[in-house]
Amino acid sequence: MTDYKPLVIEQLEVMEAGEAGFKKRAYTKAIRSIRGMTVPLTDAAQVKDMDGVGDKIYKKVVEILATGGLAAANRIKEHLNVGGLKELLGIHGVGPVKAKELLDGGYKSVADLRAALGGKPDLLNPTQKLGLKYYEAGIQRIPRAEMTAHETALLSALPSSLTGVIVGSYRRGAANSGDIDMLVTYPDAMTDKAASTLFVSFVTALTSSGYVVDKLVSGPKKWMGYVRLGDGIPRRLDLLLTPPAMYGYAILYFTGSDKFNVAFRKWCLTRGYSLNEHTLTPVKGGDKPAPPLLLTEEAIFDFVGLRFVRPTERVDGAQVVAK
């Protein structure tokens, strides 16, 4: 029994690389669903009702299983350097439009860009230049043990009156992560200005210790850049200072997973509320009152009528269950 999953994913990834905007996101979602299959893919009917697999993508899967390939993918390979496109998209700050612009200019790889940048400094913006500098590091996953070491380093430097938590896949218990995302908050009695001052001092301490190796964005409430433990691999770090009133929403949103978040937001809409990383608001034109102050994830789950789900169990919409 042949498992066509690797072939289907490879062909759809070619299509994904050749698209932008909502079409690209459609392929991304379909690929994620198919990759998550726990059984062999032997019949196209298995993917028909999967999240992200619409009629057009389903027909492409049928073609792949019937012919061993996808004519549209072959055409993209002929007209686009797909391998190069994917490599260029791996550079932080380089999106589909910029990647195609570079390809059209004859730059088909990271090596091409590095060779050209000295004579053409305007080829990339500052963010893209740092992405190029740390390209090899950026495409490597971060093992959980290393994530824990980063967590220890960050919390050790954090002022005692601030609270910090690493979110994303790490908080969900994943074996590895793509980067480090940390939310920082402060007591309700503390002013925003005082919290920002402490946040800046936190970043200054990280920089003085040698932990920070490069910065992308540095402000009173947000910092993005590259950090390193000792002589280890440079890693992407995002720090975000969040007001206490928004912290519960932020930690819920940034923990994920993407599928879980989508299902959670859809549920909220059925209850007459719109949810984002900042707050919960009544749907325009509805009759729901503004929610009370909800400071924790547990309070948000309870208010919208959902059973609380631990971060490690937030996989997809199957966990979004009424209490």
List the model feature ranges, each with a label.
Residues 307-323:
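Acidic, low-complexity intrinsically disordered tails
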